[in-house]
Curated annotation (Swiss-Prot):
It comes from Chlorobium phaeovibrioides (strain DSM 265 / 1930) (Prosthecochloris vibrioformis (strain DSM 265)). It comes from the Bacteria. Gene3D superfamilies: 3.30.1130.10. Its EC number is 1.7.1.13. This is NADPH-dependent 7-cyano-7-deazaguanine reductase. The lineage of its organism: Bacteria, Pseudomonadati, Chlorobiota, Chlorobiia, Chlorobiales. One of its GO terms (biological process) is tRNA modification.
Length: 116
């Protein structure tokens, strides 16, 4: 996954706290154990500081995971780390909610709050 794909633009209202919610209901990756596809919904909530993530670049970033063998927990934390690196938000939470596999569902949430 190439985090360099992520682009940002200047936040016009950096003095105001507001929350942006981004939902990708068609996220796909591959189970590293079975090689079978995994399907999930990725939700990102963040309070921007100086920059916001550009949605087209985020879409292409998410597509990078399509053929990657990676566990749910690692996907969630990788997305969080890459978004923090790209835009340094005041706060951000990434939640991944996975379709049932063998009758079991999983939801993973990872968060970050800027220091200072």
């Amino acid at each position: 996954m190439k985090k360099e794909i992520l682009e940002v633009f200047d936040n016009t209202y950096p003095d105001r706290n507001y929350t942006i919610e981004i939902v990708n209901p068609e996220f796909t990756s591959v189970c590293p154990k079975t090689g079978l596809p995994d399907f999930g919904t990725i939700t990102v909530h963040y309070v921007p500081d100086r920059t916001c993530v550009e949605l087209k670049s985020l879409k292409y970033y998410f597509l990078e995971f399509r053929n990657a063998g990676i566990f749910y927990e690692n996907i969630t934390n990788r997305i969080l780390d890459d978004l923090v690196a790209a835009m340094q938000p005041r706060s951000i939470t990434v939640t991944t909610k996975w379709k049932a596999r063998g009758g079991i569902t999983e939801t993973v949430t990872a968060s970050h709050t800027a220091q200072g």
